[in-house]
């Protein structure tokens, strides 16, 4: 994999390290229309095919679907330790509804890849059944998970047709992992990574959010971890989720700084990368 920093340019020290700067993407909101076959937004377009174009002029080919807002972690940069109000379960889209919306996007908007996210998608019961339904649309189906219950699901996900998997992991140190996620689950996540490899969900990708003064001293540890486990590591710049938060170097470890840290230890090779999601 590659280390991506900005438009068209990337660096790598091996085939297993990836650095991502998150850019705004085009979002298509499809409100539930439980009485109709398709979302209202597509009713007048069902007979035609339309490309989705983002603000940078790129054709969007990937659809992200959040299957739940619930999570079994309480990561500090994501949600409070307690007091969360979840969507009522009867307000979540059913698997049938998700499949219908996905079919519209595939058949009429040129989508060829679907990523399932959350919350934590694996807390949604019977998720492999949804993966199977989406895979039958002829698209690549990917999953982003915290990995805590992946040992239980990896093989069934692979059998259902899952193409790719990303596992969020922000520290390789047990005490720090506990502090960041408020859950003592590092061993289960590492075991989940092994389970994904054993199930053939290759290449397995690790998403590591770098935060100054929190885990930026683990950059090289993650790079070595990727090489030793034969998994891709994607270093991701921290982006606050709250609209009022300010992007600043007191929290953020800029991509250039991560690259220099890697460069001090490894030889980096410039390569060119397209605009597709990592």
Where are the predicted features?
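Short hydrophobic targeting helices and cationic amphipathic motifs
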Residues: 14, 19, 27-28
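A C-terminal junction/extension of Radical SAM enzymes
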Residues: 219, 225-228, 232-278
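Radical SAM/AdoMet-radical enzyme domain recognition
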Residues: 92-115, 123-232
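Short, positively charged and aromatic/hydrophobic N-terminal segments
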Residues: 29, 34-39
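Conserved alpha-helical substructure of the radical SAM core
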Residues: 44-117, 121-140
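A short acidic, helix-capping loop that chelates divalent metal ions and anchors anionic groups
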Residues: 84-88, 173-180, 242-246
């Amino acid at each position: 994999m590659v280390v991506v920093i900005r438009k068209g340019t990337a660096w790598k020290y091996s085939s297993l390290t990836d650095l991502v700067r998150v850019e705004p993407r085009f979002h298509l909101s499809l409100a539930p229309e439980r009485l109709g076959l398709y979302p209202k937004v597509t009713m007048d377009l069902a007979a035609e095919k339309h490309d989705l174009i983002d603000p940078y002029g790129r054709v969007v080919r990937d659809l992200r679907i959040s299957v739940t807002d619930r999570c079994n972690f309480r990561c500090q940069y994501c949600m409070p330790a307690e007091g969360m109000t979840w969507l009522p379960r009867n307000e979540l889209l059913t698997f049938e509804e998700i499949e219908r919306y996905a079919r519209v996007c595939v058949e009429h908007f040129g989508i060829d890849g679907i990523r399932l996210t959350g919350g934590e998608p694996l807390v949604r019961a019977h998720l492999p059944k949804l993966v199977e339904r989406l895979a039958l649309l002829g698209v690549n189906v990917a999953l982003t998970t915290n990995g805590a219950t992946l040992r239980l699901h990896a093989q069934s996900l692979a059998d259902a047709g899952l193409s790719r998997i990303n596992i969020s992991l922000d520290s390789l140190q047990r005490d720090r992992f506990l502090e960041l996620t408020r859950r003592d689950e590092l061993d289960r996540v590492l075991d989940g990574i092994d389970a994904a490899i054993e199930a053939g969900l290759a290449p397995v990708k690790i998403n590591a959010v770098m935060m100054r003064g929190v885990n930026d001293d683990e950059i090289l540890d993650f790079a070595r971890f990727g090489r030793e486990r034969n998994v891709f590591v994607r270093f991701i710049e921290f982006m606050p989720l709250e609209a009022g938060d300010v992007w600043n170097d007191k929290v953020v470890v800029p991509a250039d700084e991560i690259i220099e840290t890697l460069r001090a230890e490894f030889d980096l090779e410039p390569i060119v990368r397209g605009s597709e999601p990592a």
